[in-house]
Amino acid sequence: MTEMVEIRPLAPNSWPDLCALFGRNGANSGCWCMWWRESANEWAEGNNANRERFEQVVTSGEPTGLLAYADGNPVGWCAVAPREAYPRLFRSPHLKPADPDESGVWSVSCFFIKRTHRRQGLRRTLLDAAVDHAGRMGAAVVEGYPVDTREKPSGDLFTGTVDLFLEAGFAEHIARGGRRIVMRRRP
């Protein structure tokens, strides 16, 4: 990536920047980064409800993630927060924690890169920044839930790929079958 990129934690005053990046569709199918945070019934309420709920999370001051800026404009997003912020992980047969009571675990749960900035290494830059950020916030370990595309391609890459996480120093932690595996590293 040749452009200078600045990475900042999402804060209430940068909510409009996230909205500009995500657009009317909330990044992906009206998600607004709520897939891992909500029940299936809440998720089914759709785009506007997800947007409102995520705005409430952001304005509460709870950690949510990092925004990447190029030339002052938002171009990328990485969700990173304490694992307990993502209750859907605890219900997932493939991703549920081996020890749900383990403390100090932070999760990198998704990425969104503006179309004009894809395939330039920004996802890796955001992942490295997320690990550093989680460490500064007290994380003992950082988890990710990437898709393994080494044998079968996938169009569902919002959580990243195994190769991306391997390149960033993560190691496989849990693989229970399915498309995603749990990977970890220490900050």
Which residues does each PLM region occupy?
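Conserved N-terminal entry element of GNAT/NAT acetyltransferase domains
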Residues: 1-36
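Conserved donor-binding loop and adjoining core beta-sheet/short helix segment
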Residues: 24-43, 69-70, 74-87, 100, ...
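Conserved acyl-donor/pantetheine-binding loop and adjacent beta-alpha core of acyl/acetyltransferases
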Residues: 56, 69, 73-110, 114, ...
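Conserved acetyl-CoA-binding loop-helix of GNAT-fold acetyltransferases
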Residues: 108-113, 119-136
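Conserved GNAT acetyl-CoA-binding A-motif
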Residues: 127, 134-155
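C-terminal "cap" of GNAT-fold acetyltransferases
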Residues: 155-168, 173-187
